Amino acid sequence: MSKELIKRILSSIILIPLTLYFIFAGSFYFIFFTIICFLVASYEWHKMTKKLNYKLLGFTFLLFSFFTFYESLTDFYVGIFVLLICVATDIGGYLFGKIFKGPKLTKISPNKTYSGMVGGYFLSLISLSYFMSWINHEISINWFIATILLSTISQIGDIIISYFKRLSKIKNTGKIIPGHGGLLDRIDGMIFAFPTFYIIELMGVLSR
């Protein structure tokens, strides 16, 4: 098992239980946790970007993203679903990319491959199957489409953050997680996935 895979798994093992702990600790603690994460992510974005319009756009988006993060995770099952799909997409993409390699997906993020993209979809759909079994719910076409959409958005989020890191000529967005980089490095897909799912929820197309 490579160091990078261990890094991704350990990040998930730490971040998901930590998030769930603050959810169950009560609304005050969860709000506090959300604000701290927002401030850390905003600081990393500020350090990474140079142009004022990028900074303002990023701050505005992060504010909306963490609002949807909080709103989604007040519903335990919704929060778990989005987190699960993002983690599965990240790990599936890494595993398939390393095993099957193949053509690069984009020059912006040279480690991304088409095989990795397929792997992200594959593991996210496997995760959907287990999730729906857990909540005793059949997989509908809407849930299938939502999973594919979230996986796609998560991968796009990864590429977008990689683009700005490339512009700034940095490898990681920060050093807050020892050996793992910054918070944005770990949640790059999630900050795009949560707003997406929030909009899907507002549309009322997913039955539970």
Briefly describe each language-model feature range.
Residues I35-Y43:
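Central hydrophobic cores of alpha-helical transmembrane segments in multi-pass inner-membrane proteins
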